[in-house]
């Protein structure tokens, strides 16, 4: 075994050893601020609608003092700059951290390295003044659609750019199709069904990744939940938080979750896909693929018609 292979094997061995009294932890992260996943109709994009959705979404997080990180794409909104600032201030008022999600939700599969870098920098022009006014930093970046680079050169170039600009990647372990349910929820004839089936679907995904964590990493570890800023999640957040508590979770900040050694595991996936880091680690180990539960076909159809 070469020295490099021995180091990798040692990392996997150390990561797989659970700590005494280990408990379940999850970091809540919410993408596509100010609103995403369900904003195809113009009425949902007004300041009043986005403010109401945001206040409902944040209320249980604020009341329960749950850390949350919101990822912003400032160029994907019709809000005037002062109104966008008001929405982002609502997040900061609730104790949230804000992260960079590129200017316009840029897809690294379809964007040159130079243009993608400009997307990141352009988003900073909006986000840095907002967070600095609160004494915070712009620490985290999340790849839109979890696309980290279709070829090795692109992946490496953007990772190096992010590091040079002081960003930490915000991976996802609890990946899911909440945005599809959110789209279905906007249709009056599907709203009740979407609300009824949403939490059972999410819990099935969480249960899958809990099991898969043990198979891939050797133990459960602090997970990172991906959600989107949507009307559905603003209505279902109390139930979603209760679901996690029922499963034995406590809520931690993104930075705290990332301190776990699991997030230092080798991850060498290169390609067009965007999926959970648990899948990426399993691929790096050469394990057979196992996919999380799919969203129902009717949800997929409804989202496609949006």
Annotated model-derived regions:
Residues 12-21:
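Hydrophobic h-region of N-terminal signal peptides that target proteins for export
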Residues 34, 144, 179, 296-297:
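Proline-rich low-complexity regions
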Residues 3-12:
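Sec-dependent signal peptide recognition
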